[in-house]
Amino acid sequence: MTHRSRTQRLAMLAAAAALIAGGVPGSATAFAAPSGAPFAPAPPPVTVLAAVPAADWVRTTDPPSGISAELPGKATVRTATVPIEDQLVDGRAYGEETPDGGIGFAVHDMPGDQYPLEEDLQRFLGSYTQNTAKPLTSHDVRKLTVDGRPALDARPTSQSDGEPVTGSIRLIADDKHLVWAITLGPQANEKALNAMHEQLLAGLRIP
């Protein structure tokens, strides 16, 4: 597998895990392709775009919530509807692929404090593992507050084709939404991944 196809696959799987993780049941695997495409049990391929300078990052807005973030190019959008107790919750993930790894954010239409953020993180790890058959573990987990909202930071790590994988994730509990910001890629690109994640967080806006 080439370096580019590997990072493409990581971005796709991270987006799928973030969306599916919004649901409580471990069997919740409903995943929709971009708008207009038929439903499928697995996410569609991620479009690979060349890396662009930081000055060319594009602000991407989630229309239903108004939540936005800057991403390095035009984002690939994915949607999912996940069962939570007696209701269906809509989620959307906006991701972009770079030569260094995948980056993106996801929004679930549910109160961010409906479940502890630690449980949400565990569902993300479990969803990724379910999709890849490779364990994803979290390190350096810490609670914080972002603009008055509860948040949780962690560093996920795994393996992909024998290569170490690392990244960063932030979960934010808004009154009406659960927000994820994720960066994931080969450990060899850790410095670039950290810089991308910092820029992603700096540009994240929750109305």
Language-model-detected regions and their locations in the chain:
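Short, solvent-exposed coil/turn segments at beta-strand boundaries
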Residues: T98-G102, I172-L178
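Surface-exposed amphipathic alpha-helical segments
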Residues: L19, A75, D120-T132, H177-P207
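Second-shell loop/turn segments in exported
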Residues: V82, H108-Y115, L144, L184-K191
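Secretory targeting and sorting signals
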Residues: M1-P34
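Signature of long, low-cysteine stretches enriched in small and polar/charged residues
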Residues: E70, T76, A80-A93, G126-A173
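A short acidic-to-branched-hydrophobic micro-motif
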Residues: A93-E119
